[in-house]
Every structure is written in structure tokens, then in C-alpha cells.
Amino acid sequence: MAEAKFCLSCGTARGSSAAEEDGGTKTRLRCAACGWTHWNNPTPVLAAVIELVDRDGQVLLARNAAWPGKFFGLITGFMEAGETPEDGIRREVAEETSLSVDSLSLIGVYEFLRMNQVIIAYHAAARGEIRLSPELVDYRLFAPEKVRCWPAGTGRAMADWLRSRGVEPQWMELPPGKRAIEVDTE
């Protein structure tokens, strides 16, 4: 998402400036006219490793319509205002796959610096008929030991979940200069 070029409070052109904060001097986007600061804090993103309890524990990976290549990844989404992370990931799983979540457990919290996000990843034991939302174009079911993890963002959550199941993760190799979503995971 592009940065706003003008102050969101008064409309003056923004620029970077240094100011004393807790911990010392910090340079941020600040408005010289009104002092408003653009904090640029990371966005929390929810992710689910979906284990299908009614399909022998297979893992569901899906392909987003906006992604290049044929990458299949975890179900992810943003929290809504007033929603807990657990409620948010249950909603995202239902919205994007039509699956019902039986239980959730936290896998971990992961940085995704390139996107300025913090990923809160859950294991979701789920069941039901899979019907994808329009933002997803395909899905694949994998036995846990057949999943190839990607070396970024949610791929580390998948690897941690596999290890918790006694499965040593297998990692995909990315060509130089390629992001995980630009490669074929089929």
C-alpha cells in the first residue's frame, strides 16, 4: 500500500523528522505543521494451518487469486475491529473455505518484515465440505509429511507445526530473486 504524501490530520505535505521518544531519538514521518506522527506499526495478520480431521488429518493449502505462479499457502486474513485473534481466524477459515473449526491452538507469532506484518498462526482442526471464496482459486490437500515449507512468513509457522507433530519439515528451494508466491508448490 502506498504511503500517504500528506498529513492525515491537517493535509500538509509530510516529511521525515527526528524527535526524542522513549529510548532516544527516532526518525519517523511527522507533520511539521501539526506534529501528527505516522507510526507505521506492523499490521497483525492471522494464519491457519488447517488440519482436516474428517480427511485423515490432511493439510489444506490454498492459492490466492492475486498471487503469481502456482503457490499454495495457508489461509490468512486480517482481524476485524472488536474481534479476538481466535474469533478472527475461525471467521477467516469459514469465509474462505466454508469449513467449521473444531479447535484452535496457537502455533506461534512470526515477523514478516517485507510486508510490515506480524503473523499470529494457529493450528485449526476443521471439518466440512470445502467451498472456496472468490479470493481463492484452488486448493490442495497434503499429508503432513508431503508439505514443502517456504522460507518466509507463514512457511515458518507450517514448519513449527510439522515439528510439533514429529515431522521434520522439507523446505522448498527458491530460485535467486524469487519470492515464495512466485513459484510452483504443486
State what each model feature region is.
Residues M1-A48:
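Acidic, metal-coordinating catalytic segment for phosphate/diphosphate chemistry
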Residues S17-A18, L99-G108:
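A short coil-to-beta-strand element that immediately follows conserved catalytic motifs
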Residues T25, P68, L113-Q117:
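Short acidic/glycine-enriched loop/turn segments that link adjacent beta-strands
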Residues T43, E83, P134:
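Short beta-to-alpha loop/turn elements within the nucleotide-binding domains of ABC transporters
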Residues L52-E95:
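Conserved Nudix-box catalytic region and its N-terminal flanking loop in Nudix hydrolases
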Residues Y110-D138, P144, W161-L162:
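Active-site-adjacent beta-strand/loop module that shapes the phosphate/pyrophosphate-binding cleft
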Residues G128, L141-E186:
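Long C-terminal interaction/binding lobes of large macromolecular proteins
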